Amino acid sequence: MIKINIGLKGSGKTPKLIEGVNSAIDIEKGNVVCITEGNRLMHDITQKARMINTEHFDIKNIDVFEGLLCGIIAQDFDVTHIFIDSIFKSVPNATMEDLEGFIERLEKLEDEFNVSFTIMVSAEESTAGEKVKKYIG
């Protein structure tokens, strides 16, 4: 499953992310990962989730970010859900067009490794392409 929550700053994406991660810990049979820029959510998200702060990595583009995801999955085949908070903060040079291609590659990871992805996108929904709109929920 791929799910995208899209909206401008202040539209409630972060509370949905926190609730989603904390709920997934109780529901998922495997490990849950939350990727965010900074440590601001570490007190809101259960310690049972693996938190990854992208500030520790030099993420220049969406391809490097995809490499990070592949590394997470390769290191732990028990990962069943990856939550990504504010992808454009973790990948500041990324565009909505980049996100379209990224979603296509996530579909392959989802199918091959049975990993679900929930992505928070700070943007107006009207700027999303068809591939992104398919997963808005």
Q: Where in the sequence are the language-model features?
A:
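Conserved P-loop
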Residues: 2-72, 129-130
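Short coil/turn segments at beta-strand junctions that form active-site/ligand-binding loops
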Residues: 1, 30-31, 77-80, 115
